[in-house]
């Protein structure tokens, strides 16, 4: 198109340029956020107990004086993006001075809080998560069924995870942090768990979600089912135990099977196997058993552009890391019915996820 012919086309060119450049440099906002987490900016403001001026913040973070203006410019971007907010305070000379406070988003970065998601930031923006994109062109042209992660590192994600103790710790912390937010979903959807006497949390990690369910419903006997290297050394109690095994071979019997952040790691063929094994695990309950899926359900018709963008970004992450996928309602329906289930119900939870109840 010749953009130089009239003002309308010039305007279109300028808007297209802004759109392009914005997406090119989106990574700067992400990395500035990572820097804020690593520096502990949210912790410093929280611990200060009141709005914090730039000199106070720089002093608390023990920054070199030459970096104060750099901190200001990072904060300017992060404030624009909604992670911090500005207010004014009176200094000793009674002059007003700019100070920073937390916003709902940065409150999610305060260490020690049950809602802290700092480990998610560290995991998602870890060098290993970013460096793999350097071989994306090679990955597209190779005639191999492998993930972008495998193309970049020569091994699959899970093998890498189990060999790198530092990264494994970040991953487990991130999963635990995400699970703690699940407490809100439990409170809002108690009916999902009422009437159950037993539940198995498949690929339940160190048991964060199972513990939340057990706290809310002490009568439910919860089993955390995961790989030996994950649960082998964990100790449970009368109503919370840990079992190791392979979910592609069998799942422990229970009234309900929980699959939280599991099926999006796998393609349809392997997800179908997991669902069929889960169906076998609840077979003793007849029509009263259920499988509870916590995952994303993409709404193609959503008016919330930001929400859909986040869900589609998650889909590409699952693709490049695991050859997994985030699914639309229609894709969930096909997968569920192909596994032999008769009905399902989808309930949006936690902002961008869904709770899917699946019945035999």
UniProtKB/Swiss-Prot annotation:
Gene Ontology BP annotations: methylation
Q: Which residues bind S-adenosyl-L-methionine?
A: 202-205, 226-227, 246-247, 260
The record's annotation in Pfam families points to: Dimerisation, Methyltransf_2
- The Enzyme Commission number assigned here is 2.1.1.270
Q: Which residues form the active site?
A: 264
Induction line: Up-regulated by copper.
Catalytic activity field: (+)-6a-hydroxymaackiain + S-adenosyl-L-methionine = (+)-pisatin + S-adenosyl-L-homocysteine + H(+)
Q: InterPro entries of this UniProt entry? A: COMT-like, O_MeTrfase_dom, Plant_O-MeTrfase_dimerisation, SAM-dependent_MTases_sf, WH-like_DNA-bd_sf, WH_DNA-bd_sf
Give the enzyme class.
transferase
For this UniProt record, the keywords arranged alphabetically read as follows:
Methyltransferase, S-adenosyl-L-methionine, Transferase
What one GO molecular function would you report for this record?
A: O-methyltransferase activity
Tell me which family the UniProt entry assigns to this protein: Belongs to the class I-like SAM-binding methyltransferase superfamily. Cation-independent O-methyltransferase family. COMT subfamily.
> What does the protein in this record do?
3-O-methyltransferase involved in the phytoalexin pisatin biosynthesis. Can use (+)-6a-hydroxymaackiain, (+)-maackiain and with a lower activity (+)-medicarpin and 2,7,4'-trihydroxyisoflavanone as substrates, but not (-)-6a-hydroxymaackiain, daidzein, formononetin or isoliquiritigenin.
This protein is called what? (+)-6a-hydroxymaackiain 3-O-methyltransferase 2
What organism, scientifically named, is this protein from? Pisum sativum (Garden pea)
Q: What is the lineage of its organism?
A: Eukaryota, Viridiplantae, Streptophyta, Embryophyta, Tracheophyta
| Gene name of the record | HMM2
